[in-house]
Amino acid sequence: MCDEANPAKPWQLPDVVYGNGIPALCLLHQEIEQFYNYIRSTPTEFCLRAGAVRRIEDVVLSIWPSASVDLFGSFRTGLNLPDSDIDLVVYYKFWNPRLLHELQNELVSQGVTDPDTVTVLDKASVPVVKFTDLISRIRFDVTFNSVASGVQAADLIKDFIRHFPELPKLVMVLKQFLSLHGFNEVYNSGGVSSYALTLMVISFLQQHARSNRRLSEHSKLALLLIQFLDYYGRKFDFFKYGISVLGQGGCVEKARLRSTLGENNWQSVLCIEDPVTPTNDIGRSSYGVLGVMQGFGAAFVKLSKLVDSDSSKIVGPILANIVEVPQSIINYRAWVHYNFQHLLTPELPCADSLVQPSPTGSTSPSASASASEDERSGGPATIGFGRCDDPPQNIDIVADLANLKMN
């Protein structure tokens, strides 16, 4: 059913499948699968990113030969959108704020970036050099020494991905949703970071797993997405509870987090306990979370009405009612594939191998890179975690929807 996608919008199912009586939840489930397969990095995009990372590492080592560079964030976990930035950390024992400007100058002098795209935030809580790589047009954030926990967090996320195969598919849809509504930037709009969103999804999946509810493999992603939007958009009390993934995960009364997060941190509206550094509240800067909550609630209403409608009257994509891919992203990906397919190699590296090992000594498997249809003639390329498909279970889709309404 997904073999012949819409050529103009490859993340959508072919028009012919709509209006044929296929249950809406089945359609939405397949649309989420299709969207995930489309939006994640292709081998060409992965190689372009890998090359950009190595260029930055070469610049760093040309300045400080004894330094080391490590990768963290969404590119390390495989949860990056096509336009996501890349997060790097430089470990150097002779730290000084001047290093930020030294790196800035060297990146410009070696032709890696344009001076107009470089920003040095030396007064930020985590000082960072932000710039755009000229060749790939990929944005970078480079920090120094202070985010070893970021590498550990990325590896922890990969462990959760192995445990919850639905996690990356839900996260990618939700990340695109936040991006479209301008809620993905913490620094500029008080939105929800990629890490915070991922922890929210993990906590939700942990609670769902404890409920022992078995969902049909043909509609699982649709039900989980709708339930997530309902939970955080209409039911979760952000003022009373914090979010945790430690142990069995779930919601924790904020008052109970006071001892670990401190007198001030635990009072943020979006309170998320950092599983790597429990004294850190991941959501403390997300002052726009109430807007995010309203967006989730509105998306729930849209999707729930559609999946509850007569399936014979569904004439187009369901997911498109809350998620779209801007033409600028489509154009960028076309540009990448036209100009950089020569970067493909028989065996793609994993993200962890792109840079020197960090002081944490992390060696866990790396992120996934996937192939677009035109690159899969030799079979899909998989890096790190693979897909985990459980055997189909004989659960009635209608019963799944009925249970959703009851909850």
From Swiss-Prot:
CDD domains: NT_PAP_TUTase (cd05402). Disruption phenotype: No visible phenotype. Flies are viable and fertile. It comes from the Eukaryota. Pfam families: MTPAP-like_central (PF22600), PAP_assoc (PF03828). Gene3D superfamilies: 1.10.1410.10, Beta Polymerase, domain 2. One of its GO terms (biological process) is polyadenylation-dependent ncRNA catabolic process. Belongs to the DNA polymerase type-B-like family. This is Inactive non-canonical poly(A) RNA polymerase protein Trf4-2. It comes from Drosophila melanogaster (Fruit fly). The lineage of its organism: Eukaryota, Metazoa, Ecdysozoa, Arthropoda, Hexapoda.
